[in-house]
Amino acid sequence: IISIMANNQKMRTESDLLGSVELPADVLYGVQTLRGIENFRISKFHLNEYPLFIKGLAITKLGAAEANHKLGLLTDEKFNAIAQACREIMDGKHHDAFPVDMIQGGAGTTTNMNANEVIANRALEIMGHQYGEYQYCSPNDDVNCAQSTNDAYPTAIHLGMYATHLKLVEHLKQLIESFEKKAAEFADVLKMGRTQLEDAVPMTLGQTFHGFASILRDEIVHLNEAAEDFLTINMGATAIGTGICAEPGYAEPVSYTHLRAHETE
């Protein structure tokens, strides 16, 4: 339902079990996100300040949609619209529609619903419908199909952390390159090596920088090993680990086929 306020701002009405609320007609999020904004004003850090986490959410929703589409749970029209919405978010669009506080009750339910509503409303727009017309594409029944906050949210965190890890390694490699350049530049500059806060034996300044580079190379190896744990996810476990509400044959494709295909995008 679209209404016009006294200041000529268009509003739309959405409802949940607690009642109806009005929100600006042009915002991509919905009633659950609005309730989250009102209920959780805790840290002053908001979801839209963490783009790699939002990207992880979009990748998670895209992987789930691909698996559900192949199982016949999403029509071609719904799937194509949801997939386009997810890819737009992965490309950095619509991040302003994720305003909820990072600290919230419910183990991330508000964040999960924020993503579901944004993707659903953008999908509705792609299909030619109005925001909030969830009978055509539902945040819960379609975007969140076969998922729970308890598997989608930690999966998104893992993917966001893995993307952060890749950026960290990229920057460390640049720093190693800089150290190696300095090692070559100062290869003939003598200095005293020090141990126990005292002068010890001669060495070159270049050797010092070469040592810095070697340490960082070792750290990259350790980081890469640790980051493998981020690729261990629980998608398909749903709410309590039993896979309830997910179709047989959903968990393996969503985890091993679809999410793996998008992990480095």
Residue ranges of predicted features:
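A helix-coil-helix interface module used to build multimeric assemblies
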Residues: 6-242, 246-256
